[in-house]
């Protein structure tokens, strides 16, 4: 447990907070690792089988109906639990092939990231995208190499791959013994102990550790002569040629501690969690329009990074997820809201274990809480007491896929419009309208194709509105930030279209990069942006 001043004080509560996101490529085992962290914390007693989700228990962090049907994480869940004196907030990001803006936004609320890598596949495309977002924020990144119970790449090759592809050096905290399907366990470099591999009851409950000192005369027999000799050679090579552990570099995001294990069998999960909590940082200062705001600033402040409607069909409600940046949150407190520039009362605050909720009396920097949203909150809104500070708006990432959507049943038009607007405000989709055309026809833009399927599913199940969808050829949207003439007088290629976004800002939809260049060359003084602020 961290050294803390007075229990219950702002400083003490902040010091024991850890807020992190798990990032990975699809099928690296992210939801499984999340489940196992909850298992070891005591938050759940048995872990649901992710692969056998239709017939077995559903994973705790996958709560939306479509996720349970497909066995994937579509939205980002926020979960809180206690372990060894720490208060932990996990942000579980989508792990399917077509991820959405939700994935990027969650990283804005995290203080550190756990990068999950499949031992057999190494660094993959989606991991690279998410890693870049983490590097931009300079947050600490911890690496867990998963699926060691199967044949995988040589660990030295994985380290080299991380440095060449991601540009970050790795320092193994433990080291695998056997990577060709003959996995025997890991060697913990800091304690000089070998933890022998035990698969337990297929990972449903906690595994009791079996540790053997490196100098134990029984070890060669336990591992076999070949693996024992290889381990001793690799330890020597690591000590001579490997990067030494430097906590300062880790906390700057310049060196990643590397762990090996098997989340599905629980092996290596507890040692990873223990060391992660020791090495990671408590909530840091956040930049605002009035300068840096330290976490222990007595004035309360936070920002909205996610909005989710209908998390529980029984409630039919809408929740805004807020990351607390400073001060103490208390139930029923009155705060200044940047979106309306008014004082509002925060009622019914909640914390989560996926879709299970608990009422919140108090919360501290680093915590994620859900606020009942009557329709006033927007992504990027700031909430605070004292000085009227604003945190940077969460950027709108340019969608890459577009479709024209309309209601099949004209009598359900009201539900259709309400559903599309609400999903747009959540950030699940982006909407665009052509000039002179009303809500009868809306252009929807998404970062990943699966979001179209999510849109159809949610409109049908939550709003009883079925839609007609026609794929459009556009692949780019650009926001007009400066124009030399009236918008309607701009010269555009025949395949490009003018439109307005949900905040009535002018945009151009393009089919290809050539059309973008043509527009810029034929309209001197025209300036286009790839992203837009949600505050503007």
Language model segments and positions:
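Structural and coupling elements of P-loop NTPases
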Residues: 1-536
